[in-house]
Amino acid sequence: MTQKGSMKPVKKKKTEEPELEPLCCCEYIDRNGEKNHVATCLCDCQDLDEGCDRWITCKSLQPETCERIMDTISDRLRIPWLRGAKKVNISIIPPLVLLPVFLHVASWHFLLGVVVLTSLPVLALWYYYLTHRRKEQTLFFLSLGLFSLGYMYYVFLQEVVPKGRVGPVQLAVLTCGLFLILLALHRAKKNPGYLSNPASGDRSLSSSQLECLSRKGQEKTKGFPGADMSGSLNNRTTKDDPKGSSKMPAGSPTKAKEDWCAKCQLVRPARAWHCRICGICVRRMDHHCVWINSCVGESNHQAFILALLIFLLTSVYGITLTLDTICRDRSVFTALFYCPGVYANYSSALSFTCVWYSVIITAGMAYIFLIQLINISYNVTEREVQQALRQKTGRRLLCGLIVDTGLLG
């Protein structure tokens, strides 16, 4: 009896953890896993205090401290929402604010337009190499692309259409082209062909869950040079895929080592590769495209090419309509470089500035489209081209525009 009585306290122990309380609209779980409130966004930031102290005392600030400050700001920048405050990705904000400002400033004078329109690609390339070097995902370029489409269409409706040179049919064609671009981008943003691990029992993940897991993986590896952002994406997939991974190849040990992905714990099939930015393997991976913030692989390559083609056609058509309105009786090519009186009024100056901005963006997209067509004709992917250049096994043709890898025919 005494033994049974002594075991009673053991039975009373609770093994189940208490359920988490629901979050109010201003509460959230921060990157440390603790409950926080948006009202305390300016409180208890040791890294920011240290940075201000070092700035006041004219001392140098370590890059790691700057990264921690930016991570803290990014984590605390939230808006109240149902069931908890939602995080706002700060990389989407600069295009929304700076693009209209730059374009309006560029329309004040011809020289200002030259300076601004020259500096915009330079700043975009600088930001690209900065994020590419750190192997981070960013919504900056996706935000820039979508907002550019919307803002160019807005300027067209406000400044070009009222002049009476654009008919209803032409406006309808341009509008349909814009919607087709958005549909193609939506298709290209879907699963590019992620590989699944047969040994994993995880269920399929949605695109939003995959993006969330990728962000968690990035937060875990920030500040550690050379760390890959696989994070919690290992052994996970966005789609149940029977072609996900192959068995161990029967070739040489070197070949088996090359095909094995230590991050995803699977054997990659031919032409698949692990994306260090997305943190997962992709079938027939071509490249990671910052304009869609996703990889381009087997499943979305056609949609990516289609989006580029529709964008080029729509952009050229919109540029032609605008120049025909503000620079009458001149060819499109002549009006680009010689349009007398275009800066006489602000409306035509803004339209002309937006035309040149569209020309710059269109030229960049045309280059990407041309490279894609060349790679398709040579039956190679962009990753295979870059790998051949690094290993010095490829031959440059046509001033480097074409690269013959010598691997696939």
UniProtKB/Swiss-Prot annotation:
Which PROSITE patterns is this protein grouped with? DHHC (PS50216)
Q: What does the record list as GO biological process?
A: protein localization to plasma membrane; protein palmitoylation; protein targeting to membrane
Q: Where is this region: Disordered?
A: 215-255
Which reaction is this enzyme known to catalyze? L-cysteinyl-[protein] + hexadecanoyl-CoA = S-hexadecanoyl-L-cysteinyl-[protein] + CoA
Which compartment or compartments is the protein found in?
Golgi apparatus membrane; Golgi apparatus, trans-Golgi network membrane
Where would I find the DHHC domain in this sequence? 259-309
- Molecular function terms in GO for this entry? protein-cysteine S-palmitoyltransferase activity
Q: Which residues lie on this side of the membrane: Cytoplasmic?
A: 1-87, 133-136, 187-302, 353
Query: PANTHER family from the xrefs?
Result: PALMITOYLTRANSFERASE ZDHHC23, ZINC FINGER DHHC DOMAIN CONTAINING PROTEIN
Specify the protein name: Palmitoyltransferase ZDHHC23
